A protein has these predicted regions:
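Active-site-adjacent pocket scaffolds in enzyme catalytic domains
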Residues: 2-83
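C-terminal domain-boundary segment and adjacent tail
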Residues: 65-146
Length: 146
């Protein structure tokens, strides 16, 4: 906020091996920091709640792990319930020829599993739905909050 940012999309409301804030809100919101509600909007990554736990599905390792048909089904179900889905990938996740770091086995699996299939899966999902930018989505959210 102090840097002039209007929104942030860095919170992942899931507990993972490497990161995550499992009890973070799962909808677009104004975060509280030191008891003060920020003007900045937080746009958390999309999750599916199963058995009381948040599970990622639409980006990073989860996107590469789950089959495309399942991701599409979750996105459709969310749309019917009025929920948005953020689909995101890091550049290294769509470049099977990219340089690989020498990592411990578990971290290597998480970082590189199914990188070779990510581009085709992403193309299929992009053909199946209409997407917008986070900027356009939050413009709608701000209008609805007022």
């Amino acid at each position: 906020e102090e840097l002039g940012l209007h929104y942030d999309a860095s919170i992942f409301p899931v507990k993972t091996f490497l990161y995550g804030i499992p009890d973070a809100p799962t909808e677009i919101h104004h975060p509280l920091v030191n008891g003060r509600e920020l003007a900045l909007l937080e746009v958390p990554m999309s999750v599916l709640k199963i058995g009381g736990k948040n599970i990622g599905y639409s980006g990073g390792f989860y996107f590469r792990l789950f089959p495309g048909w399942l991701i599409k089904r979750i996105i459709r179900s969310g749309h019917r319930s009025g929920r948005h889905s953020i689909v995101y990938l890091h550049p290294r996740e769509v470049d099977p020829a990219g340089r690989r770091l020498d990592l411990p086995l578990l971290e290597s699996f998480i970082q590189y599993y199914n990188v070779a299939g990510a581009q085709a899966k992403l193309a299929g999902i992009l053909r199946s739905f209409q997407f917008t930018s986070i900027r356009k989505k939050i413009t709608c959210e701000i209008s609805e909050m007022q």
